[in-house]
A protein has these predicted regions:
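N-terminal segments that mediate ammonia production and transfer
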Residues: 1-119, 125-289
């Protein structure tokens, strides 16, 4: 059970602070008082050195990818400030609240990364008997693919299913959609809200199995005196970005939990709706799964 945030620009570097403003970044970070089981980020940027430069080792990359994952709560980790100030072309941020008693280990921290893709997920993937998908006797994914994610959780299994679809030659957005369809056969009422980042695209999906927050999540939020924040727990909203001239400059999307005023351009995704954005042009579109 996590809080997700991601953005894609029109090919230039912007920091999270530049996109949201310091107050909103602070309120997002403050969610880690509850979502305190670690955090992580995946950042895409344009390297200073020319692409494909032969420098004695592997040729220099066209896109630089950096990952950070920690078992510390974001509010207690000074690295969060540094990363939130880092100008990048695209980014994912993840605040974790561990589900189904899955262990608080670095392997289960998100984003996961494999085959050039970063992945974050909000939801507990369990069947109607309450059994987490990683405990079921028959795995829906190949073990080798599952291990390639580096994780051991239900979220890692979701990512592995996406990777298998991509390996069959299916485009990224359709791979995410097909992975959800396959997993819903086993765990129909689970949440598959997620974000995936490649060197070219940001995929944001709202795919909740039901509208109500899980009773465990409600209990935890009430314990922290923030029960009012749990009402729209499964909502993901997005806002188009503009540059200083008012021209389109990309898109930002995030889970609820901090102010996302519709008067400021925030729009909730419908359930089973996906946003597909380019982190090179900033253009984005919506589709149903």
């Amino acid at each position: 059970m996590c809080r997700l945030l991601g953005y894609a620009t029109a090919g230039f570097d912007l920091s999270l602070h530049a996109i949201l403003g310091s107050q909103a970044v602070g309120e997002y970070r403050a969610l880690s008082r509850i979502h305190n089981d670690g955090w992580g980020a995946s950042l895409l940027s344009n390297p200073v050195e020319p692409a494909q430069l032969s420098d004695g080792g592997a040729p220099s990359p066209e896109t630089g990818t950096r990952m950070y994952r920690s078992t510390l709560a974001a509010e207690l980790d000074p690295v969060f400030d540094q990363i939130a100030e880092e100008p990048v072309r695209g980014a994912l941020f993840h605040l974790r609240l561990a589900s189904s008693n899955l262990p608080l280990i670095l392997e289960n921290q998100q984003p996961f990364f494999a085959d050039g893709l970063s992945f974050i997920h909000n939801g507990d993937i369990s069947d109607e008997q309450g059994r987490n998908i990683v405990t079921l006797p028959d795995s829906p994914v190949n073990e080798k693919t599952f291990l390639s994610t580096g994780g051991r959780s239900d979220s890692a299994m979701f990512f592995a299913m996406i990777l298998e679809c991509i390996g069959s030659g299916i485009p990224l957005d359709e791979s995410v959609a097909q992975a959800v369809h396959e997993l819903r056969r086993i765990c129909p009422k689970s949440s598959y809200n997620c974000m995936v980042q490649s060197q070219d695209q940001l995929i944001v999906l709202c795919a909740a199995g039901h509208n109500e927050a899980a009773s465990r999540v409600v209990e935890i939020y009430n314990r922290y005196g923030r029960g009012g924040k749990v009402r729209d727990y499964r909502v993901i909203s997005y806002r188009a970005l503009s540059d200083e001239n008012g021209d389109p400059a990309g898109v930002v999307a995030a889970s609820s939990g901090f102010p996302q005023d519709r008067n400021e351009g925030w729009t909730p995704l419908k359930n089973d709706e996906m946003l597909i954005a380019s982190n090179r042009t900033g253009r984005f579109r919506l589709r149903s799964i």
